[in-house]
């Protein structure tokens, strides 16, 4: 069952990609969707067997590397963390496959698209099932390549080309540091197998663990789009909307958080790395919410809401890895629902993505409105919605730690939650509730999608409504044996007891009260005092504030001016001096020129004069006699004579070269 679970998406990708012309569009749809849905059913069975019964499974496939002391086996590992990621990845992926049948129905490259989707899913499975860092790195890299292919799916668009390259190159920064971290693990521990590294971690110097942890954290920062290496995130919206749902909900962005959770027994021994995770997650949460508030493109706004993965990084910094996993699962479902709902809106209004030109779509898209309302309520952690059970718990856990950093992070993340609520209300209000602002033709043709588009929305909404309440005791219940991903227990992991019983009620309710209050005030101002907002926007202060946040804190401008430009100049000089300089001089260009000069010089020795030929014969005779003589005497003198003759005969060659 477990091998079938792994291999089915790959088979679907191969058939759709290489035999697409034979099976046709319908055949590609059928094969890829059936393979992924079957894999999802098997993943649910694996979740019940491995997760609930707490029976880890390992499958030894083959020996991969056997080089001196490095011995790497290709082993697939199924434990609580792996099967939880399976549920997240495969349920969302199967629904995205079904949704894409209708959404991409008019695209001429359906087979290629579904092949990429299935390959993406397969490599994500490889990433989470690997038993060592090297197998994980294989999935990590190919997932990045698949994201490049999917974002650049419409390769005739220049914007898609630029965005895919930006995503690929930004992730290369994190991949480079992750590679350095893997080499540091290999150098320090002599192995890259999870079990070996985690078993030896308590006996190593904290500085070594800190260095490795920082490298892993930077790798996760790039993949999970934390602040600093987040610039690829909105640009990845150039791909089709189902791609955005798959990348930003369940696959690529969760890979970085998965790496931190998988490495929890290692980074737990470095307080520096945990504090860095804590602050990185908090800053990312506020940063993304402020930028998202000033975005006007529907998909880009939801892209910045994906940076709410900072909440999971906060949970990692609090050593509450099971809480991070719980929020990851919840986040995947409601974020996929938001993106697929956005795709339904874009599909209905002739591909227009500026939600300022929507308005009044509630009457035309009632199903889409309700599913996006449900997902938005979860995003802002309204009580008894799925996001409430994990997001608010993370905030309460931060306050429940009772030390300075976590308390400050609680208030910082609360501010981020406030602005997240504000832009969620902004999207719903301007898209569905306000007066129509778009052209009449959009409303004439606006309609809900067909069965393939609406069914995934309904399924996700049902899963989303019930999953948080049903699974909260499984993932973070005090008596559960499921969340055994910390590998060991210490008093710091019992933070949930303090969170549950010791945190004052005021601080439990504060994020919700502030979020709802700010949203209500903003809607009232927009509805009853619009001139006040317009006058403020056109004032110098309002203009500067709007420009600052709309330009994303000028971080991309800083990168382009001071980093990218310098790197390009350095690359140009390096290419000029090495690739176009010394390498060519010593390589094909220089060798060709030297041989040509040598042949020309030798050709000039032929003068057609008898006395010259007699001189050559005499020199050759003297050479052979001296060869016999000096072989029995001083070899150094012989070498000196040979060198002198060579210099005399080739003086012209050397000067010319």
From Swiss-Prot:
Its EC number is 7.1.1.2. Its main location: mitochondrion. The lineage of its organism: Eukaryota, Fungi, Dikarya, Ascomycota, Pezizomycotina. It comes from Emericella nidulans (Aspergillus nidulans). InterPro entries: NADH_DH_su5_C, NADHpl_OxRdtase_5_subgr, ND/Mrp_TM, NU5C-like, Proton_antipo_N. It catalyses: a ubiquinone + NADH + 5 H(+)(in) = a ubiquinol + NAD(+) + 4 H(+)(out). Core subunit of the mitochondrial membrane respiratory chain NADH dehydrogenase (Complex I) that is believed to belong to the minimal assembly required for catalysis. Complex I functions in the transfer of electrons from NADH to the respiratory chain. The immediate electron acceptor for the enzyme is believed to be ubiquinone. One of its GO terms (biological process) is electron transport coupled proton transport. It is a multi-pass membrane protein. The gene is nd5. It is found in: Mitochondrion inner membrane. GO terms for molecular function: NADH dehydrogenase (ubiquinone) activity. Keywords: Electron transport, Membrane, Mitochondrion, Mitochondrion inner membrane, NAD, Respiratory chain, Translocase, Transmembrane, Transmembrane helix, Transport, Ubiquinone. It comes from the Eukaryota. Gene3D superfamilies: 1.20.5.2700. GO terms for cellular component: mitochondrial inner membrane. This is NADH-ubiquinone oxidoreductase chain 5. The chain crosses the membrane at residues 1-21, 30-50, 81-101, 113-133, 135-155, 177-197, 211-233, 241-261, 274-294, 309-329, 330-350, 364-384, 408-428, 451-471, 475-497, 509-529, 610-630, 637-657. Belongs to the complex I subunit 5 family.
